[in-house]
């Protein structure tokens, strides 16, 4: 073995077996042409930016570049506030995952869908980094580089978005402050229409990288989480299940006369999949509960059942961050429940017993589902000889229904899901309605009960866990038979749908349509109003 470079090679060793295969006289250098662009790429240590020229030449809509203006907006209200960066362009946002940093300017194009019958101005300004934008007024924003835009402008307005920075390049993963494009309503929106009908002017923001925009430093391939674009199940509301009562959805409506901020505990879910209150994932759990039952006959009352609650999957219920086990009824009244019971009577081993259970809002039965204990009773002249054991109670009918939260902890405080809301002025909650079986000697109509989302939507969001990119999703509801667009609405991240409706009475929509996802929009996005002929013509597509 050779121990040093100075050691003489052995004549018959393994290292000498490959020597002198080519005579020295025949050896010559093989000419190699230089790689094209090697000199240009050398200072960047192999970091070559490959942005397609088409991306530099064409404007595309920004991911959050959709906004609207209506007479409800007040001067000084910010319509959009977007930062310079790859996130301003869908192509650059996709490419930025491969690079460590970016640098350079961008160009934006503002398109307003105005008409000759409206008047108003918006101001678009470039706000430098680290400037507090929360206190901007209409007077202060004109101190920055800005452009005044009339809503009657037909041609797109093009603006440069300069990269003002204090670093050599921006890291794609850091929230480094950069130049921001802020659009503010400068003067109120007015119309010469004799009526007071609400109207909306829509706007779009498009972007493209400037010629000096560039990415720097390729990142090594790493395992990343794949984020799905938010979508909705393609299912008509009439085929969905109600989220607060085990029945199909029979109606879709808005009604300004009903409470605008109900505090329902079932049918509540965030767009990111976070369940609120006592909302279950399975529709078979709605308004039901499981328990260990103990029966006792009381003279003058009948058979009294004491239910020690458990979760409906059989696991133990632990009081904590919700008011009751999952699926427990979230309304008040006298509920009739059916329980599969076992008796000691000969020839009557199994039977279905109907108990009456007072849910609230206040009771004398000391109902405390938060602590895992509720009571129910059935009128009987003698003991029913029921056998204690595990049961599952399902609702049958309701008497004295009240759409308020039941008694959860014998009058004491419990953790509750927050009320639904807030809404912008003119917005009304979209309600999914079904009807409960009711026992009443005076009113023969079934009792209506509403929910914020169908149970299929709740299960969809809970199982997909979408990534939230803004404060609301712009949706459109389309009739599947005629193809007509019935209304547009916003699905807020908190899990409720809002419409713009100026009427005073209820407005019902057909349940054979489907919801379509349009884009992410800010909370202040103004919706086109429904319920008027002119607006209906405007929404048709």
UniProtKB/Swiss-Prot annotation:
It is found in: Virion; Host cytoplasm. The keyword Nuclease does not apply. Homodimer. Homomultimer. Interacts with the minor capsid protein VP2. Interacts (via P2 subdomain) with host receptor CD300LF (via N-terminus); this interaction requires Mg(2+) and Ca(2+), and allows viral binding and entry into the host cell. Stochioimetry is 2:2. Bile acids interact with the P domain dimer interface and act as cofactors enhancing virus binding and infectivity. Interacts with host receptor CD300LD; this interaction allows viral binding and entry into the host cell. Residues 298-366 are annotated as: Interaction with host receptor CD300LF. It holds the Pfam family Calici_coat. Belongs to the caliciviridae capsid protein family. Residues 278-416 are annotated as: P2 sub-domain. Its main location: virion. Residues 417-541 are annotated as: P1 sub-domain 2. It comes from Norovirus (isolate Mouse/NoV/United States/MNV1/2002/GV) (MNV-1). This is Capsid protein VP1. InterPro entries: Calicivirus_coat (IPR004005), Calicivirus_coat_C (IPR013643), Rhv-like (IPR033703), Viral_coat (IPR029053). The keyword Nucleotidyltransferase does not apply. Capsid protein self assembles to form an icosahedral capsid with a T=3 symmetry, about 38 nm in diameter, and consisting of 180 capsid proteins. A smaller form of capsid with a diameter of 23 nm might be capsid proteins assembled as icosahedron with T=1 symmetry. The capsid encapsulates the genomic RNA and is decorated with VP2 proteins. Mediates virion attachment to the host cell receptor CD300LF. Residues 225-277 are annotated as: P1 sub-domain 1. Residues 1-224 are annotated as: Shell domain. Residues 225-541 are annotated as: Protruding domain. The lineage of its organism: Viruses, Riboviria, Orthornavirae, Pisuviricota, Pisoniviricetes. One of its GO terms (cellular component) is host cell cytoplasm. Keywords: Host cytoplasm, Virion. The shell domain (S domain) contains elements essential for the formation of the icosahedron. The Protruding domain (P domain) is divided into sub-domains P1 and P2. P domain interacts in dimeric contacts that increase the stability of the capsid and form the protrusions on the virion. An hypervariable region in P2 is thought to play an important role in receptor binding and immune reactivity.
